[in-house]
Amino acid sequence: FMEKVSSPAISLLLALLCSFLPVNMTAVFGGLLLCAHAFALSLETFAVTVGILFIMYAVYFRVAPGQGYVLVLTPLAFFLKIPHVLPLVLGLTGGPVCAVPLACGTVCYYLMYYMKNNEKMLSSSETEKMAERLLYLVENVLNNRNMLLTILVFAVTLMIVYLIRRMSVDYSWYVAICAGAVSNVVLFLIGGLVMKASVSIGVVVLGTLVGVLVALIVEFFALSVDYSRTEYTQFEDDEYYYYVKAVPKMSIAVSEKKVKRINSRRRSTRRRR
């Protein structure tokens, strides 16, 4: 909405600057850009945006300051139409704290989505409708059923994947991915009916399948173990009994190379004789 901020030169400059700064600064610059575009629409849109971002960043920096990449990647995943990848992958590689930046990123996306789809109404200059637009904006952003359902389902799915993948069972990561995928689809279906939200089941199923594929790729690089060679052992000390399950990592057998040395001195002496 603000042409000066949307110029390629500004975008390139911010990209270069953020590449040298911590990921949390990238999230801060993203919030400032969002506020600038909101200011270009109207004063009340700017006020609501600043209020939402202030509360959101206060919660984020208090609870999960080290998960800035989640806050940055969440709106990007929504724009790429692959948001269902996030709860599955974060459940494997992160923990419950990732639900906070995931929810904050979801709020940012829906805020931008609403501003884009209601540009004409929000940019109206009629002063008598300013209070009406303000209430309408707050009502549609904070009480958006699709947004609330998405935050709730993603948080529950992330927790399911996280809890299962930490269990001491064989192939726990694969079980966690399958359970998370099923719960994601089922929760969106049930939640859409209960909350009367507009949910496209086909899009949810397709997005979940893409999430399963990405999660399997992450599992391949993050956890390569051979469950067929699992070993169990137990021992004790003065205070505790210990029961240990050892799962070896996958390894590629390297064939031993035999180097045969030929003594050239012996050959030369034989020739002289």
Regions found by a protein language model. Give the residues of each.
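Juxtamembrane/interface segments at transmembrane-helix termini
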Residues: 118-119, 166-170, 197-201, 217-236
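Hydrophobic transmembrane alpha-helices
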Residues: 1-31, 37-38, 47
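Hydrophobic alpha-helical membrane segments of integral membrane proteins
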Residues: 27-29, 46-51, 66-74, 86-90
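Membrane-helix interface "capping/anchor" motifs
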Residues: 17-28, 40-41, 58-69, 92-100, ...
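Short, highly charged, low-complexity non-transmembrane loops/tails of multi-pass membrane proteins
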Residues: 225-271
